[in-house]
Amino acid sequence: EASYEGRPMGAASVKAEGGLVRLHLPLQETHLWELGCGRLYDLKLTYGEDKVQSYAGLRSVRLDGYRFLLNGKSVFQRTVLDQGFYPDGIYTAPSDQALENDIHLSMACGFNGARLHEKIFEERFLYHCDRLGYMVWGEFPNWGLDVTRPDAVYSVLPEWLEEVERDFNHPALIGWCPFNETWDRDHRKQDDNVLRAVYLATKSADPTRPC
């Protein structure tokens, strides 16, 4: 079942016997997720006596040459580089309110999103991004990764794909950045096959976003 601002929007059912289930849910009204306006549908899923509540946002993202399009409209990404650092908790936020405050502060300074830099952010942070209409790029903390070595892919790929699987349903997340500042090091050339393998795996796991 789907609803928007308390009003029923549609319902559907499908036979489920375990494993992956696909369901088509027609909606009576379309309310798109936009910058500064995180329009979200409330969802209720029922299986037997079990019930789960969640939410979803509708939007599209794609590249058109050098332009980034959100819902088919060109958007300039005025984003801040957010390292998720807190003086008292280092990379752990002291409270849920602190996560939300960071977004409000960024928006008050004129930014419309963030590159989540060198850290896998808390899911609650992404929830607030969804709710507030604040776009973000997901990134993997790859410091210390030696991309001149072919076996580097075995270090980064499993954990990176876990992040993609965990977060890909967030409408606020508009792109993936699996590497930060890759280049040759210590007079050794980076292995482009490492970057290519991670890129292709990312696009296979989530073909809906730029990477």
Features from the language model and the residues they span:
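Secreted/periplasmic carbohydrate-active enzymes, especially glycoside hydrolases
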Residues: E1-E118, E122-E123, H128, L132-G133, ...
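Active-site metal-binding loops of divalent metal-dependent hydrolases
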Residues: K119, F140, N180-T182
